[in-house]
Amino acid sequence: MLAGDWVFVSGTTGFDYSTMTISSDIVEQTGQCLKNIASALQQAGSSIADVVRVTYVLPDASQFERCYPVLREYFNDVRPAAMMISSGLADPRMLIEIEVTALKNST
């Protein structure tokens, strides 16, 4: 959703929409979530570099540490305000859901 220069990407899961499949591995799901988010941001004229806030939702909070390498790869020098919530998700195959807010041209 766009509101001026703000881009809101709602909870995004690790589904690969080209194949309608989802990995059973949280690291792979995290990478796919971020690919899906990057695509949505690009369609809105934005990018990962513009992300100012991110929320992670995981059914099993102990798995979050496994996601760090992928998150560092995507966010690199971007340091958005972040929060992690431990909560069930709509589909038991989902191991992580990520939501971001971006401000276009914030870099």
Label each region the model flagged:
Residues 1-107:
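Short, polar/acidic, helix-capping and beta-turn segments at strand->helix junctions
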